[in-house]
C-alpha cells in the first residue's frame, strides 16, 4: 500500500504548530531528526529527565499519510498554522510500504562489539558470526534511537562489557546499569555471563523498555528495574553508568558507593575534554582509571579500591 510522505524543515519554535497541523489532517506518524546531523553543528541529545523533551534548534520533520490523502489539504493546514511558511522547505512524495521496510532494514543492521557481543534487530536474521555457542546475542527493537548500540556512548560500554567477559570478570557477577534507557547494557551483561542485573532510570518509560527487552531476550528473571529513589541500597561487582558528564559528576558519591571493593565501574556519556575533571572526581575511590575514546566520546573505567 502506498503512502504519502511529507518532509518539512522547521525550528524548535515552529515545531508545535506544525505538529498540531499534521495531527489535524490525519498524519499516521511523525518523526523528527536533527537537520544539522553529520555536520559540525550536530548536537547530541541523550537521556532527558522525566517530563523533559529537549529538541534541536533546526529539525527535519517527516510525516506519513494514507496514500489517498490530498497533499493540497495538508499544505492548506500548514499554511493556516504558519502563513509565512517557506515552501521551498516542503516536499511530498509517494512511497511504497516496501520502501519504508527496506530503509528500516538498511538503517539498523546487526552490530558486533568486541569479540562476542552482537546487537541484532528483531527483523534481521542472525549473522553467521553470531551463530556460535560463545556469542552473546541481544535482540532489540530497532525503533530505539538511544540505547540501540548505534551511539558511541553505548558502543563504548558494550565493548567494555565484552572485554570483561573475555577476561572472566563478568561471569557470575552482579551488575548495576545506572541510567539504563533501553536496558541494552544490563541485558548484554546477563547474556555475557552475569547472574543478576539491576536497571535504574528516572524515566518510567525506560524501565518499561528495559523490562520488555529483558523478557524478549529471556533474561527477565535475572533483571530488576527501579526508579532511583526506589533502588535497594547495595553494592555490585560491576557498575556501568551511561549518562551525561554533569550527572556523573553529581552522582560520584552515589555511584562509588554502589561498587563493591575490587569491583569494576565504567562511566560513559562523556565528551572529549570532559574526562580530566571526572578522572579527578573518581580518583579517591578508584584505581587503574583509564580512558577509551570513540570519535568525540570518552569512556572512563576503573577498579574500586579495597
From Swiss-Prot:
Belongs to the methyltransferase superfamily. PrmA family. It comes from Xanthomonas axonopodis pv. citri (strain 306). It is found in: Cytoplasm. GO terms for biological process: methylation. It catalyses: L-lysyl-[protein] + 3 S-adenosyl-L-methionine = N(6),N(6),N(6)-trimethyl-L-lysyl-[protein] + 3 S-adenosyl-L-homocysteine + 3 H(+). It holds the Pfam family PrmA. Keywords: Cytoplasm, Methyltransferase, S-adenosyl-L-methionine, Transferase. Its EC number is 2.1.1.-. Gene3D superfamilies: Vaccinia Virus protein VP39 (3.40.50.150). One of its GO terms (molecular function) is protein-lysine N-methyltransferase activity. It comes from the Bacteria. This is Ribosomal protein L11 methyltransferase. Its main location: cytoplasm. The keyword ATP-binding does not apply.
